[in-house]
């Protein structure tokens, strides 16, 4: 039995004067049709008196049907276990819909309280009509348990026969990707078409309006410009694919102050930590290409720690110690979480494919290298060492041994030159094949005036992936700081390094009273700040996108 929504006397009666509020509602026709389909079981006396706007386009009506159906399913039937507490929302949950009404005063971490009054009025009226998601779910659940029988229901609504009752009432879909399990997406076309005319959610651009002040936060501007629906994450939703690559000013890592208020005691530290990882997602402003300086050693002294790469996947710590104990007592450091190197593999995880061997003497390292196969790289004069090792399931596998010559940690071009820390930059994300002399040569070619370069090392005098470069003039220093990211291309590797001002322990340069552990590298500030002065200085919108720098406390503790 076909069910028509066009010529229905019930629908016409729904718009008479018995429900005066409904006659002035912009969604009156849609609500009446829904009420008719549900057997006039809905009480429409509380419908808002929003004036009808015939010419205003709804942004949701321009979206593909597949996206809309999935959003409606999530709006009308939210998951019971969904957490509505404040926090960083998942990109898949930006179709807020009715779920947002359960939050008092729209207290989203990114939303501004200075919103348009007309929008607030519409939001309040919608809340009065539809209630909270739980109330709406209870109404529909009570209706499904009423006296109407299953046979009568299917005769009255034949389109509902295709619906899965479990997914209809207990939909847990939180993403448009899961829309196949949604009741509305797989059910009646009439109901889907009907709901397309309802405005039951504020537009996504309105929700994101206050975030436009900081173009570096999550790159929302570029995401909203995609041809796909803003409710559906693009394929390149990873940080490296979705963030813009702009500089100067600040790191463009996702702003963690979305999770915390600006006064949170950990938000600045989190921003500084994220900035130290920014080289992987920012484009280089300078590129250096060429050959590294040749190396010539006479009786080199090695660090007692070596890198062992390409180890068998099933290797164990006992197997490593048994293999290398003939060269002297040693311990094994496995790559672990949070930049640490625990003495055993992470539980439940496979080894990472490389380990560090720590001997008690550099003589053990020298003996190990003598038993390795040496591959000399020309013209750099850099040797690669390979050691044949076996495991229970792999036989005779070449593992690369990378030692470190202690003299490679420092390079001074002019011993009589006084080193000024105010003209020193920090260089992060260094490649393991870069020694101090090579770093100095590259920086001097790009910026000029290099008098010193040093590679940061741990307690075993093994490099940790960062270094320092000192210039003899401020112009070269500022040019290097402004460059921020430099790509180094050699015949053996290509690596992008990150350049920041070298930080010292300093007093806040704003109040001159408290310690200033936070440094703003933007040229409009370029000062050390204490926590309160940082918030005071950067509370203005024009400065809110500045990101802090901090000294690496873990590195200092390791040394």
From Swiss-Prot:
UniProt cross-references to InterPro entries, sorted A to Z: CEBP1_N (IPR032292), CEBP_ZZ (IPR032296), CEBP_ZZ_sf (IPR038446), CPEB (IPR034819), CPEB1_RRM1 (IPR034977), Nucleotide-bd_a/b_plait_sf (IPR012677), RBD_domain_sf (IPR035979), RRM_dom (IPR000504)
Gene3D superfamilies: 3.30.70.330, Cytoplasmic polyadenylation element-binding protein, ZZ domain (4.10.640.40)
Spans annotated as Disordered: 222-243
Subcellular localization: Cytoplasm
PROSITE patterns given in the database record: RRM (PS50102)
Residue sites binding Zn(2+) 1 per the record: 508, 511, 530, 533
Domain RRM: start-end pairs: 304-401, 423-504
GO terms for cellular component: cytoplasm; neuron projection; nucleus; protein-containing complex; synapse
Family, as annotated: Belongs to the RRM CPEB family.
A biological process term (GO) from this entry: cellular response to hypoxia
Protein name: Cytoplasmic polyadenylation element-binding protein 1
Tissues with expression: Expressed in oocytes (at protein level). During oocyte maturation becomes detectable at stage Ib, and remains ubiquitously distributed within the oocyte cytoplasm until stage II. It then follows a gradual accumulation to the future animal pole during stage III, and remains localized to this pole at stage IV (at protein level). Expressed in oocytes, blastomeres and pre-mid-blastula transition embryos. Its expression during oogenesis is ubiquitous at stages I and II, but gradually accumulated at the periphery of the oocyte in the presumptive animal pole during stage III.
Keywords: Cytoplasm, Metal-binding, mRNA processing, Repeat, RNA-binding, Translation regulation, Zinc
Organism for this UniProt entry: Danio rerio
Source lineage: Eukaryota, Metazoa, Chordata, Craniata, Vertebrata
Pfam families, per database record: CEBP1_N, CEBP_ZZ, RRM_7
Domain of life: Eukaryota
Function recorded in the entry: Sequence-specific RNA-binding protein that regulates mRNA cytoplasmic polyadenylation and translation initiation during oocyte maturation and early development. Binds to the cytoplasmic polyadenylation element (CPE), an uridine-rich sequence element (consensus sequence 5'-UUUUUAU-3') within the mRNA 3'-UTR.
Residues that bind Zn(2+) 2: 520, 525, 538, 546
SMART domains attached to this UniProt entry: RRM
Claim: Repeat is one of the keywords in the record: yes
Entry GO MF terms: metal ion binding; mRNA 3'-UTR AU-rich region binding; mRNA 3'-UTR binding; mRNA regulatory element binding translation repressor activity; ribosome binding; RNA binding; translation factor activity, RNA binding
């Amino acid at each position: 039995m076909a069910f028509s929504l066009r010529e229905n006397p019930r629908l016409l009666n729904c718009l008479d004067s018995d429900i005066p509020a409904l006659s002035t509602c912009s969604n009156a026709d849609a609500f009446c049709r829904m009420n008719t389909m549900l057997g006039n079981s809905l009480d429409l006396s509380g419908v808002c008196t929003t004036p009808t706007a015939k010419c205003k386009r709804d942004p949701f009506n321009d979206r593909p049907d597949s996206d809309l159906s999935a959003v409606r399913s999530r709006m009308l039937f939210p998951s019971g276990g969904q957490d509505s507490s404040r926090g960083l929302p998942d990109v898949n949950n930006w179709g807020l819909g009715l779920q947002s009404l359960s939050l008092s005063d729209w207290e989203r971490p990114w939303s501004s309280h200075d919103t348009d009054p007309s929008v607030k009025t519409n939001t309040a009226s919608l809340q009065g009509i539809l209630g909270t998601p739980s109330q709406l779910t209870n109404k529909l659940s009570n209706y499904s348990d009423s006296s109407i029988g299953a046979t009568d229901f299917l005769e009255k609504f034949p389109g509902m026969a295709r619906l899965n009752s479990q997914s209809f009432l207990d939909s847990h879909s939180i993403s448009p990707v899961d829309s196949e399990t949604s009741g509305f997406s797989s059910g009646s076309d009439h109901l889907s078409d009907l709901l397309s005319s309802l405005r039951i959610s504020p537009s996504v651009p309105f929700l994101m309006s206050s975030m436009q002040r900081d173009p570096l936060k999550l790159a929302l501007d570029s995401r909203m410009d995609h041809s796909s629906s803003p409710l559906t994450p693009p394929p390149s939703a990873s940080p490296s694919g979705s963030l813009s690559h702009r500089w100067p000013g600040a790191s463009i890592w996702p702003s963690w102050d979305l999770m915390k208020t600006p006064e949170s005691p950990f938000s600045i530290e989190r921003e500084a930590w994220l900035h130290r990882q920014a080289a992987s997602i920012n484009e280089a402003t300078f590129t250096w290409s060429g050959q590294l300086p040749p190396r010539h050693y006479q009786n080199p002294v090695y660090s007692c720690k070596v890198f062992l790469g390409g180890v068998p996947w099933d290797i164990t710590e006992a197997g490593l110690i048994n293999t290398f104990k003939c060269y002297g007592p040693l311990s094994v450091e496995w790559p672990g979480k949070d930049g640490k190197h625990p003495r055993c593999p992470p539980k439940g995880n496979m080894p990472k494919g490389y380990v560090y061997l720590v001997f008690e003497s550099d003589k053990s390292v020298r003996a190990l290298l003598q038993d390795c196969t040496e591959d000399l790289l020309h013209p750099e004069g850099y040797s690669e060492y390979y050691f044949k090792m076996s495991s229970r399931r792999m036989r005779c596998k070449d593992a690369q041994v990378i030692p470190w010559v202690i003299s490679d940690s420092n390079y001074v071009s002019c011993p009589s030159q006084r080193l000024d820390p105010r003209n020193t930059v920090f260089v992060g994300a260094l490649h393991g094949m870069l020694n101090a002399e090579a770093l100095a040569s590259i920086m001097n070619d790009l910026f000029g005036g290099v008098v010193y370069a040093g590679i940061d090392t741990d307690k075993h005098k093994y490099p940790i992936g960062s270094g320092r470069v000192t210039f003899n003039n401020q112009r070269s220093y500022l040019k290097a700081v402004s460059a921020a990211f430099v790509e180094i291309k050699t015949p053996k590797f290509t690596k992008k390094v990150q350049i920041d001002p070298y930080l010292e322990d300093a007093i806040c340069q704003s109040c001159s009273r408290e310690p200033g552990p936070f440094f703003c590298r933007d040229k409009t500030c370029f000062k050390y700040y204490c926590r309160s002065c940082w918030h005071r200085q950067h509370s203005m919108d024009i400065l809110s996108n500045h990101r802090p720098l901090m000294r690496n406390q873990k590195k200092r503790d390791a040394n």
